[in-house]
Regions:
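Core-facing hydrophobic residues within beta-strands of well-ordered domains
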Residues: 19, 94-95, 175, 256, ...
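C-terminal beta-strand-rich structural cap/linker in extracellular carbohydrate-active enzymes
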Residues: 365-386
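Noncatalytic carbohydrate-binding groove/subsite architecture in carbohydrate-active enzymes
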Residues: 122-245, 254
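Solvent-exposed beta-hairpin/edge-strand motifs
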Residues: 343-361
Length: 386
């Protein structure tokens, strides 16, 4: 959410959709306009409005403040740590977790003082900021939850940047969760290799690979912006609807407890809600929440094709559902998907099972000798077993 989409009406729609988390920048310059004086009033309203609706918050603590200069240097680094400490103290006990910066590996958000992003210099500067901020935050509020990383893109250069951070001691600092923004790949299923590679980097650096992760930002736009997946432009809305659901499912499969879609509103082509209209992606989310509310992922079923996905979900009453789809090849655009049928063993169930498509339309699949043969496409389908 941004300042023009964080009001009560938008939050009502987010709540109605069934989402549980929102991400919002807490901008340092808008809170500390005079040295040592903090005004949280505009964010108090937002936090209160979220709490009324049961929404939890990722608060992104951004950016430098002209009163102090860039946080790569003193006194700005210490002043940022003071600001972060004041934030977690002021909002102690609220449903907020705190992210240190947004995409600090990029020139866009870290600064133009380097020749390129993802550099050893940027990694050292960011690690120094985290090293200053985390102890101050934990002292002010020992229960605060801190996210570090906020890494933009999952590709060779961002992997190098993370390696530089880890070599500089990032993994020895007592933050709680590593956050990533997995742009740079064509499909959500490509996240799996990217996450595995990053875990290996952590392991190589001697870090705890069991530390929590979240995907704190990723969206798939309609046109040629960052994150564009390609394919037939006339099907852009459809592809976006596929991707938002598959992103949530893949992150769930990978053990990420929180996923943030970029973005709720806006004009960049990522929005779920555009100019008062619900996009196909919005409607797909509505079906997703309705179908899987109360269910937990049990396991991924084995398939002959590694790019076919069949996930089994179960609720507390023993009810079971499958979610099934197929993906393009690694780093291929969505139009490369080849729809096909597969055999899935479902055991002793009703002879006719209800299927629900991406937008909530229902159909029937026949069971023969304990096996169904649904047709897989890039759009996840929900299959109710019992």
């Amino acid at each position: 959410l941004k300042g023009d989409t964080d009001g009560p009406e938008d939050l009502d729609r987010v709540q109605e959709l069934g989402m549980k988390w929102v991400r919002r920048g807490f901008i340092w310059e808008s809170i500390e306009r005079e040295k040592g004086v903090y005004d949280f009033s505009q964010y108090d309203r937002f936090v209160n409005d979220c709490e009324k609706r049961g929404l939890k918050i990722i608060g992104c603590m951004a950016f430098s403040n002209k009163l102090y200069g860039h946080v790569k240097d003193e006194p700005a680094r210490s002043a940022y740590a003071d600001f972060a400490a004041e934030l977690v103290k002021h909002y102690k006990g609220r449903n907020i977790i705190w992210e240190i910066w947004n995409e600090p590996n990029t020139m866009t958000f870290w600064g133009r003082h380097g020749k390129v992003g993802n550099s050893p210099q940027y990694a050292r500067e960011y690690t120094d900021l985290v090293r200053a901020a985390v102890p101050a935050m934990k002292k002010a509020n020992p229960d605060c939850v801190i996210l570090a990383g906020s890494v933009s893109n999952m590709w060779s250069e961002s992997y190098k940047w993370m390696s530089y951070c880890f070599a500089d001691g990032m993994l020895d600092i007592h933050w709680d969760i590593w956050s990533v923004h997995p742009y740079g790949v064509k499909a959500p299923e490509d996240y799996m290799e990217a996450y595995s590679h990053t875990r290996n980097l952590m392991k190589k650096a001697g870090g705890d690979t069991g530390r929590l992760w979240i995907n704190s930002e990723r969206g798939f736009p309609l046109g040629k912006a960052e994150g564009y997946a390609g394919g037939d432009p006339s099907l852009a809305y459809e592809y976006q609807a596929w991707h938002v659901i598959r992103q949530y499912l893949v992150d769930l499969l990978e053990g990420l407890p929180v996923t943030i879609w970029y973005e709720w509103g806006g004009k960049e082509g990522f929005a779920l809600y555009r100019a008062g209209n619900m996009t196909p992606a919005y409607n797909a989310c509505k079906t997703f929440v309705k179908e899987l509310s109360g269910y937990k992922l049990d396991y991924r079923m084995k398939t002959e094709n590694k790019r076919d996905f069949v996930l089994r979900f179960i609720d507390k009453n023993g009810n079971e559902k499958l979610v099934a789809w197929t993906a393009p090849g690694v780093m291929e655009s969505p139009d490369k998907i080849v729809p096909h049928s597969i055999k899935i063993a479902v055991g002793d169930v009703s002879p006719r099972l209800v299927t629900t498509d991406l937008y909530g339309r229902t159909d029937i699949v026949e069971v023969s000798n304990g096996v169904i043969e649904p047709r897989l496409t890039g759009a996840p389908v929900y299959i109710t077993l019992r």
